[in-house]
Amino acid sequence: MILAASMVLGVSGCGKSQKSTQDSGNTAKVKIAYQYGLAYAPLTIMQEQGLIEKNYDGDIEVEWVSLNSGSAINEGMASGDIDVACMGIAPFISGVTAGIPYKMYGTIAAQPHELLTNDDSIHSLKDITDDKKISVVNIGSIQHILLAMLAKEELGDAHALDNNLVAMSHPDGMTALMSGSVACQLTTAPYIFKAKEQDNIKEAESLDSVWPEGNAFIVGLVSDDLYENQPEVYQAVVDATQEAMDYINNNQEEAANILCKKEDVSAETMLGWMQDPGCVYDMKLPGVMDMANFMAENDFADKAPESFEAITTESAR
């Protein structure tokens, strides 16, 4: 099952023609797409503290757009509507190997992932029968690929559970899990923390054997157009991302006071989530090529990237 997007056909003719604005005195513009969840904390800090504006030497307008899936972000990047984006590794690999003109400028976060269940009879993937549904955020999402990795290891076939999958947003999947509409959900923070507050929800099986704690989850992307034609804007985004991560890592209580508003929880609860050992914010986390190679070998992508350098900018290396 190849997940490469047909949207990239003819993509070389798409996009905005941009030139450096710093020398001309014009106002630069950058449009940034992101999703939701604890993994996007650096983006929240960047937005709240105006860090791109701070790191750009000139006038710049930053537009923030929240989208609900990696496929939607890929469509925006392919059309040239989006300049910078953050999303899971898997849709990035699908997009970049299909020809979407962008590169990874760094990893954003690692987050804990768990396969949760409400069914006491499920202790491993071998216990999941054909009638048991598993919610993942999207087909081709990193959660889908992590489940496929576990299926390959335990069942011998990365696609063994494809017919069990239903695509739901993380919040909707959590609601379905708690109500019994699905038997399992493979999800991430903070939804694993919220779901496990319920007495009937437990972890079905660990993912550590296929995706160790600290491996990358969310990556930051920049369009080739912006990277090549507006290097000052690109550098401001990179510097702002690093500054946001430094702020989170060095000022956790202050960061929790900002981030708690996004999830509508107390600062104390947010701080507890952030201090989970699986919650890491760093621009050079491992795992990107491991996932790329797995996806190519198991028909989730049409090919693997030629090299890590071929799909990244210097700030990611």
Where in this protein do the model-derived segments appear?
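Bilobed "Venus flytrap"/periplasmic-binding protein-like clamshell domains
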Residues: 29-51, 114, 118-194
